[in-house]
Regions:
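Conserved, structured core segments of small domains
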Residues: 1-121
Length: 121
């Protein structure tokens, strides 16, 4: 069964958990319980701020390192979910449901990509 990586895209420093509506955490918990019981959710987590991260780049045969925060970047990956679904349509439906539990005044995006499986793995 194919796996899909859902990358949560946010504008860093624009989402404040204190700004969430009172039912947000309960809605998210219920969705996570449902998706886990369905055997779809393999792993998920939020990511620490870019101020605590580094970017490594390979160019001209050398590795360069840039420490965050990355002020030139509007959107960053704020979290991820690894899903195992029967097809892309199912991955998209779970992703739509994930977005729908968020407060309406937040802007959150998802990039859903199928994991390329290695032959023989």
């Amino acid at each position: 069964m194919p796996r899909y990586l859902s990358l949560v895209r946010v504008q860093e420093n624009t989402i404040d958990m204190a700004d969430a509506d009172p039912g947000f955490e309960a809605r998210m918990g219920a969705l996570f319980e449902e998706i886990t019981k369905a055997g779809v959710m393999l792993d998920t987590a939020g990511l620490r701020p870019t101020a605590e991260s580094s970017r490594l780049t390979w160019s001209d045969g050398k590795v360069s390192v840039t420490d965050g925060p990355f002020t030139e970047t509007k959107e960053v990956v704020g979290g991820y979910a690894l899903l195992q679904c029967k097809d892309r349509a199912e991955a998209m439906e779970w992703s739509r449901r994930f977005l729908a539990v968020h407060p309406p005044h937040w802007t959150v995006g998802l990039e859903v990509r199928e994991v390329e499986e290695m032959p023989g793995a």
